[in-house]
Amino acid sequence: MIIHPKVRGFICTTTHPLGCERNVLEQIAATRARGVRTDGPKKVLVIGASSGYGLASRITAAFGFGADTLGVFFEKPGTASKAGTAGWYNSAAFDKHAKAAGLYSKSINGDAFSDAAREKVIELIKTEMGGQVDLMVYSLASPVRKLPGSGEVKRSALKPIGQTYTATAIDTNKDTIIQASIEPASAQEIEDTVTVMGGQDWELWIDALEGAGVLADGARSVAFSYIGTEITWPIYWHGALGKAKVDLDHTAQRLNARLARRGGGANVAVLKSVVTQASAAIPVMPLYISMVYKIMKEKGLHEGTIEQLDRLFRERLYREDGQPAQVDDENRLRLDDWELRDDVQDACKALWPQVTTENLFELTDYAGYKHEFLKLFGFERTDVDYDADVATDVSFDCIELG
């Protein structure tokens, strides 16, 4: 079928399979250009492997270090009459090109919060991956979590704590500057956000993997976080989501103590703000990203997801000099270091009050934001003919969990 973008709110409801594949190929090429190292992870499990930072982790492990990878995600496959989600096509493309490079690649499509997913992962590690993994990446960004056992569904809330938060934002449907107000989260919403977005599920995964004996000696685990700056703190770090990320930090400290006994470790990696399906949903982030992209591009500091993950693997987790990674006071790996430079943040703060609907495209990189957003779904690529027919029913080596 012929597919063009249709945007509703912060979601693009259509996806382009070929565009998604080209996006993945672009990330593979960027990784290969930095050379393949053999002194890093060999068997890698990625939870939340189909888009954003999780996908970039999988690409970096496979094409930067020659690792075998197992990816878990929750995506909608395409059919002959309807396109699937971008993550489905991203994962299909990854699988195709990893196999072409002679690498083991297997995927599981299902609820990563479920015990069934853990059981299937353990089975595959034992039967197909030599029995153990040496790196587990935790990269889930889900608004909903069904609790294993009880089946109770919890939802996260992107809300401030204590008082209503009002700030300048972009109405991305109309490309206008608005004042957005968000009511504060209730105590229950805060608790539920911690349950969905905190470290509980990460710990359940490590419990299961360790209990089954499928974590190698020296195995590492990393989970992703974002802290940001005072511009976004009310909605993020000081909001309900921030409480979940603090819980993630506490979890990392517990897991690190456990894995360190066998020569491994666990860290939270704090990454920079990028255009992903997850960040597009957070109020104020599109405007902040549009500003920070412009400033960082001007300073030659801009990075996308693949550049961030490349730096995380090569300069932090698996340093060529064999030294332990540099961490902050909370034992976190900081990849937001360039974004948080004073010269970058001071420029952002100076720019923020000046932005209006009239000068939005001129003062910020909102055009770049819109381009990157549509690109997530396979659109806006110059190497794809969007008026040509494209097959939407794409299958690959993926186990469907019922």
From Swiss-Prot:
Q: Which domain of life is it from?
A: Bacteria
- Location of the active site: Y236
Picking any one GO molecular function of the record gives:
enoyl-[acyl-carrier-protein] reductase (NADH) activity
Instruction: Give the record's GO biological process terms.
Output: fatty acid biosynthetic process
Q: Which Pfam families match?
A: Eno-Rase_FAD_bd (PF07055), Eno-Rase_NADH_b (PF12242), Enoyl_reductase (PF12241)
Site feature: Plays an important role in discriminating NADH against NADPH: E75
Give a yes or no for keyword Mitochondrion in this entry: no
Provide the residue positions that the database annotates as binding substrate. Answer: Y226
Entry keyword set: Fatty acid biosynthesis, Fatty acid metabolism, Lipid biosynthesis, Lipid metabolism, NAD, Oxidoreductase
Where NAD(+) is bound, by residue? 48-53, 74-75, 111-112, 140-141, 245, 274-276
Q: Give the record's pathway.
A: Lipid metabolism; fatty acid biosynthesis
Into which EC class is this enzyme placed? Answer: oxidoreductase
Q: What is its EC number?
A: 1.3.1.9
| Catalytic activity field | a 2,3-saturated acyl-[ACP] + NAD(+) = a (2E)-enoyl-[ACP] + NADH + H(+)
Q: Which NCBIfam families match?
A: EnoyACPredFabV, PRK13656.1
What's the family?
A: Belongs to the TER reductase family.
Function comment: Involved in the final reduction of the elongation cycle of fatty acid synthesis (FAS II). Catalyzes the reduction of a carbon-carbon double bond in an enoyl moiety that is covalently linked to an acyl carrier protein (ACP).
| Subunit description | Monomer.
Task: Name it.
Answer: Enoyl-[acyl-carrier-protein] reductase [NADH]
Source species: Xanthomonas axonopodis pv. citri (strain 306)
